[in-house]
Amino acid sequence: MLPITDRLLHLLGLEKTAFRIYAVSTLLLFLLFFLFRLLLRFLRLCRSFYITCRRLRCFPQPPRRNWLLGHLGMYLPNEAGLQDEKKVLDNMHHVLLVWMGPVLPLLVLVHPDYIKPLLGASAAIAPKDDLFYGFLKPWLGDGLLLSKGDKWSRHRRLLTPAFHFDILKPYMKIFNQSADIMHAKWRHLAEGSAVSLDMFEHISLMTLDSLQKCVFSYNSNCQEKMSDYISAIIELSALSVRRQYRLHHYLDFIYYRSADGRRFRQACDMVHHFTTEVIQERRRALRQQGAEAWLKAKQGKTLDFIDVLLLARDEDGKELSDEDIRAEADTFMFEGHDTTSSGISWMLFNLAKYPEYQEKCREEIQEVMKGRELEELEWDDLTQLPFTTMCIKESLRQYPPVTLVSRQCTEDIKLPDGRIIPKGIICLVSIYGTHHNPTVWPDSKVYNPYRFDPDNPQQRSPLAYVPFSAGPRNCIGQSFAMAELRVVVALTLLRFRLSVDRTRKVRRKPELILRTENGLWLKVEPLPPRA
């Protein structure tokens, strides 16, 4: 009998019997074994952490706040934080180490040669990490943004045809119509003179309007009256951002008992219900009519995103499930509206700030539209806007909608200088940092569209400019986004003169996308109708 057994029985007030002595002794042995295993595991973790720390010593790091907080709270998601980050990048041009508290190291990569091994790696070697993207999982499921391994590869293969030029061309009419609705609102608000408007507010609704038509063939009139579905998407984006900055909400069992967590769940249910209803109704029609008759009935109409996914098949004829299609549709709605609205808003801001470039873009667009009765851009017109495209690219360099992407290494990754990123480390590929790296982009603060002049190509790495990421996990919808960007910018310049509202200071705010702290206000002045 263990000496402690007799004492334990006495403390519990239990009579000594052979069975009780045996049972308590066995229980204590199991408890000791469990504690030993726990201690062993803890020691292994400590040893692994120590080895990782030693391997990370070769990477430079900015001064920490202290040993406990590390760099936590030093680079806040606001204008001051971006300026502090720029000061660091002026001295550390390739890769740097930051500590989120005492035990979570992150490597930040800010140079084309150093982001190449990460962005070029397969989804199995450098998948999206769960720490930064996990909050979106209940909303977006296993769509392209969050899925991994074979599932990601299969979905990427099946979704690629949805972004073929032949599918995108009919969307041009939708882009034109959505821009027309927004511009009609602007004219009404301006009443013939200049009016100050928040670009993010108006353009975000416009991109959501376009996306609902492109994804679901559904006209919600959300630019005129907010729908429950659109309200839910906007709320989900805001709640996801808020959760990132509340450490106690990182734990699901706490978050979903909070007011924010309950609202997040309700908004998810709303979005999922809408998407699922559309998919099921469309699938029933497809099965009843058959693919050939169903496609024939679609002639003359735009084939939307849901249609393409319902028709998608593997080599063996296997189709995507309703859940798979829902995840991809929700992902496209999330990724497509915020990023594009950010890109358009910052582009219009730059043209308002530099009227000489605005006027040159306007002249280019007027030349393309000369002799037309309708102010409507067609697919082939997009290639006739070289200077406008240069301005868009420079704006995406200076103000990338997505400022960083994160990856978690599942194996050691070697950098160009021979240093090794240890397995298990989370790496932040800083798109903003790369686009503002002074060794890659001289005078990076200056807005200069001629950096992208095709007649004067610069000797730069293809990875110096990555607003849509790069490699196997690059943005599948970048052609869609660039088409919408050019249409909306072109029609806006054709109809309005833009200027900066000097009474409202622009202060950047990197969240899920690059926003501003108090809106992006521009003065919008209607131009007289074309002769």
Swiss-Prot record:
Cytoplasmic side: 44-531
Location of this chain's protein in the cell: Endoplasmic reticulum membrane; Microsome membrane
All ranges on the Lumenal side of the membrane: 1-22
Binding positions for heme per the UniProt entry: E335, C475
A matching Pfam family: p450
Impact noted for substituting F59L: In ARCI5; results in decreased synthesis of omega-hydroxyceramides
GO biological process: ceramide biosynthetic process; icosanoid metabolic process
Enzyme superclass (EC): oxidoreductase
Residues passing through the membrane, by range: 23-43
CDD domains xrefs: CYP4F
Any Gene Ontology CC annotation: endoplasmic reticulum membrane
Function recorded in the entry: A cytochrome P450 monooxygenase involved in epidermal ceramide biosynthesis. Hydroxylates the terminal carbon (omega-hydroxylation) of ultra-long-chain fatty acyls (C28-C36) prior to ceramide synthesis. Contributes to the synthesis of three classes of omega-hydroxy-ultra-long chain fatty acylceramides having sphingosine, 6-hydroxysphingosine and phytosphingosine bases, all major lipid components that underlie the permeability barrier of the stratum corneum.
Protein name per its UniProtKB record: Ultra-long-chain fatty acid omega-hydroxylase
Species of provenance: Homo sapiens (Human)
Gene: CYP4F22
